[in-house]
Amino acid sequence: MAVGKNKRLSKGKKGLKKKTDTFAKKDWYNIKAPGTFAVRDVGKTLVNRTTGLKNANDALKGRIFEVSLADLQKDEDHAFRKVKLRVDEVQGKNCLTNFHGLDFTSDKLRSLVRKWQTLIEANVVVKTTDDYLLRLFCIAFTKRRPNQVKKTTYAQSSQIRAIRKKMVEIMARDASSCTLAQLTQKLIPEVIGREIEKATQGIYPLQNVHVRKVKLLKAPKFDLGALLGLHGESSQDDSGQKVEREFKETVLEQV
């Protein structure tokens, strides 16, 4: 008889692992947009429950969500723009967010670029009155003059430089003279783009002038009172302030 363990006799039943539902340890939280947008209730996010030293609120703070502006404004004309919202505070089951940036969809940007015209881009770093440091990117395209027969609409280098200078001046002036919330209200109806188009009419006619991207470089020290004021001091209200598309700002004649 062979010396050693009899494998067949010592073999017992396999211990089956108990299946645990991972979602049982998680909670859903509501994402609330600032009052500058028409729709306040953005969606929901999932996070692990508070256990021991791990706090659920700490895991939620700093999360960034990308939302279509069409959903926030209930207007399909804004579908090509995406807004980034950052969670700054958690109250109960509600995540209070603040504006973190803006961008265009890649398909919209590609659809704007065409033959026989000049693309002009400019960017500027500005600080709002409430100490948010932002970088704004602007894009514009030349268009035909009235009664123009020539197919191409190429601008000269001197004209491009002059247009770019106007872009930087207008973006810097408009952004540095208002708060982040007020700047958001200007960006939604594209006030800055129309202002640039009007100011550069004498240099070269432009079309499709947009602030295509807003990047948040640095935020000031967190102020809970300012955030609650932005959310109307109540996270239960699902309605915000709708920014009308017809909103127009007075343009200085000297620009």
From Swiss-Prot:
Chain coiled-coil ranges: none
Keywords, in A-Z order: Acetylation, Cytoplasm, Ribonucleoprotein, Ribosomal protein
Domain of life from the UniProt record: Eukaryota
Tagged with keyword Cytoplasm: yes
Pfam family, one: Ribosomal_S3Ae
Compartments in which it is found: Cytoplasm
UniProt-listed InterPro entries: Ribosomal_eS1, Ribosomal_eS1_CS, Ribosomal_eS1_euk
GO terms for biological process, alphabetical: translation
A GO CC annotation given for this chain: cytosolic small ribosomal subunit
Any one GO molecular function term: structural constituent of ribosome
Modified positions (N-acetylalanine) in chain numbering: A2
Annotated SMART domains: Ribosomal_S3Ae
Subunit (UniProt): Component of the small ribosomal subunit. Mature ribosomes consist of a small (40S) and a large (60S) subunit. The 40S subunit contains about 33 different proteins and 1 molecule of RNA (18S). The 60S subunit contains about 49 different proteins and 3 molecules of RNA (25S, 5.8S and 5S).
UniProt-listed PANTHER family: 40S RIBOSOMAL PROTEIN S3A (PTHR11830)
Family that this chain belongs to: Belongs to the eukaryotic ribosomal protein eS1 family.
Name under which the protein is recorded: Small ribosomal subunit protein eS1
Organism: Pyrenophora tritici-repentis (strain Pt-1C-BFP) (Wheat tan spot fungus)
